């Protein structure tokens, strides 16, 4: 229902307009306060890059963060990552992730980023505290990438990158809750790079698509072509589950059942195993896999995806960030 409201297909969005106006008024006032220096943002001693979005829901932001961290690491840059840690609840903040940190503590996306990149990752509702925690333990870190947080103006930033769903884009264009917008589309004029996940990019936007890899078994780490798996039940607890189901079909998989889950939804063995009958194979997103690995069964697999950016702009962006991180 919410997708129909945000896309404008359902007229119910009109009933929510008063709340949207209030949301827009408050969010605009907050940004203006920081712009006029009525509120002061904390500036880190090293460059900060924000990877965020203008809309609620899945835009491919986390794959962009992983891509960015890995690309900078390949260039010899030491990167730290901070996040709010949505879906997690730590005993205290900031929380610096380790091999023992669970998604219940830190949230699924920070754990995924930590496992994929090996970069220092810290979570806190106050992102400046997360930055300080990383620098205290890893003083050699040269640049911070913040996963989400475009609207978290308490943390000063040097570069802003926005990820957009190229198919859904901005829906009906209204602020939450009548529409999907956290900020209006005009905000794109002030950011440094716009990365468009799928669809048809517009002038000045960087095209991106998500390239699926081989399916990975949660228990053994065995890899195989996902099309070899039979009697597949697909689950996806991401911002836009239909994208994952479409990816499976593109890979030649025709799931017997597709189960969309809420983004950041907590998972347990009883609930997940109940989705699969005898002889069926469970295939999930990598984001779900980090929550299920501890109690996975032998027929549970995940399909990782990697961001692939096209054109000349990605190289220019990476050169800019490498120069910033190197201090010249």
Swiss-Prot record:
GO cellular component, one term: plasma membrane
Lineage, highest ranks first: Bacteria, Pseudomonadati, Pseudomonadota, Gammaproteobacteria, Enterobacterales
Pathway(s) where this gene product acts: Glycolipid biosynthesis; lipid IV(A) biosynthesis; lipid IV(A) from (3R)-3-hydroxytetradecanoyl-[acyl-carrier-protein] and UDP-N-acetyl-alpha-D-glucosamine: step 6/6
Protein name: Tetraacyldisaccharide 4'-kinase
GO BP of this protein: lipid A biosynthetic process; lipopolysaccharide core region biosynthetic process
Pfam families hit by this protein: LpxK (PF02606)
Single GO molecular function: ATP binding
Function field: Transfers the gamma-phosphate of ATP to the 4'-position of a tetraacyldisaccharide 1-phosphate intermediate (termed DS-1-P) to form tetraacyldisaccharide 1,4'-bis-phosphate (lipid IVA).
Catalyzed reaction equations: a lipid A disaccharide + ATP = a lipid IVA + ADP + H(+)
Enzyme Commission code(s) on record: 2.7.1.130
InterPro entries, A to Z: LpxK, P-loop_NTPase
Keywords: ATP-binding, Kinase, Lipid A biosynthesis, Lipid biosynthesis, Lipid metabolism, Nucleotide-binding, Transferase
Gene (UniProt): lpxK
Family matches, as SUPFAM superfamilies: P-loop containing nucleoside triphosphate hydrolases
Record-stated family: Belongs to the LpxK family.
Binding site for ATP: 55-62
Record-linked NCBIfam families: lpxK
């Amino acid at each position: 229902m919410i997708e129909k409201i945000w896309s404008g297909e359902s007229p119910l969005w009109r009933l929510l307009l008063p709340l949207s106006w209030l949301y827009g008024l408050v969010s605009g006032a907050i940004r203006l306060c920081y712009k006029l220096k009525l509120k002061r943002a904390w500036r880190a001693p090293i460059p900060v890059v924000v990877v965020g979005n203008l809309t609620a829901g899945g835009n491919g932001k986390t794959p962009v963060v992983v891509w960015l961290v890995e690309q900078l690491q390949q260039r010899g840059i030491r990167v730290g990552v901070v996040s709010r840690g949505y879906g997690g609840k730590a005993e205290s903040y900031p929380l610096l992730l380790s091999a023992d940190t669970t998604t219940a503590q830190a949230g699924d996306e920070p754990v995924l980023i930590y496992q994929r990149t090996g970069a220092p990752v810290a979570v806190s509702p106050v992102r400046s505290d997360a930055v300080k925690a990383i620098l205290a333990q890893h003083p050699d870190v040269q640049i911070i990438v913040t996963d989400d947080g475009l609207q978290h103006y308490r943390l000063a930033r040097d570069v802003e990158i926005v990820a957009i769903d190229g198919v859904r884009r901005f829906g009906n264009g209204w602020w939450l809750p009548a529409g999907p917008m956290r900020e209006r589309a005009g905000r794109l004029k002030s950011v440094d790079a716009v990365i468009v996940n799928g669809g048809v990019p517009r002038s000045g936007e960087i095209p991106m698509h998500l390239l699926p890899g081989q399916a990975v078994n949660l228990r053994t780490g065995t890899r195989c072509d996902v099309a070899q798996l039979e009697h597949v039940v697909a689950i996806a607890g991401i911002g836009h589950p239909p994208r994952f189901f479409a990816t499976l079909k593109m890979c030649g998989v025709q799931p017997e059942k597709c189960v969309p889950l809420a983004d950041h939804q907590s998972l347990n063995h009883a609930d997940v195993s109940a989705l699969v009958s005898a002889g069926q194979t469970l295939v999930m997103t990598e984001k779900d896999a980090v929550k299920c690995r501890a109690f996975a069964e032998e027929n549970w697999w995940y399909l990782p995806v990697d961001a692939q950016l096209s054109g000349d702009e990605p190289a220019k962006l990476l050169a800019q960030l490498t120069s910033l991180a190197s201090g010249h």
